[in-house]
Amino acid sequence: MTSTLPNDNIRNFDDQITNKLISEIIRDRIKNAGKRFSANDNISDFINPGELEILEKEVASRVRDLLKSLVIDVENDHNTQETAERVSKMYLNEVFKGRYYEQPKVTSFPNDKNLDEIYTVGPITVRSACSHHLVPILGECWIGIKPGNKVIGLSKFARVADWVFSSPHIQEEAVMILADEIEKLC
C-alpha cells in the first residue's frame, strides 16, 4: 500500500509498519483509552515525543490540499508556497496549543494570610477559535476569585486563561472550562 501523502517522511517507524497516518494512530490511542477527542479536549497525554512534528507535516499536507481545492496556486505563487507549513505550525503550536500541550505548570501556595476578600485580575487578552467555523475569537476576560485554602500568583491566571482559550471552543464552554481549571488550582 502506498502513502496518500506526498512526503513519506511524515511517517514514523510505527506508522511505516501499520501504514497509518499519525493522526489515525493518535486517534486510535484516545479511543482505546475510552477518552474523547472533541475540539476543546486536551489530547497531549496521547501524543508521544516527536509525534507533534510528524502531525505538523501531515496537517501541512492537508492544508496544501485545501488551498489547491480553493484553486490557489501553491507551486508558483511566492505568497503561498509555504503557506501550508505556516498554517500547520500556527494551528498546532499557537491557535490550538491547548489541545496538544500540557497545561502550564502553576504552583499554588497555602493561604497562610487567610485572605478572604475577592480579588480580580484583568483585563486578560484572550484569543481562541470558534469550533463551529474555526474563525478567530478575540477578547478580554476578567477573573474574580475569593481565595480558598490555596492561592496562586496573579500572572498565573493569564497563563491558564491562554492555555484554556488556545483550543477551538464556543465561548460559553471556554469560560466554564477556565473556571473549572482555576478552581482546581485554588
Q: Where does each model-flagged region fall?
A:
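A domain-level signal for the structural core that forms small-molecule/cofactor-binding pockets
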Residues: T2-C186
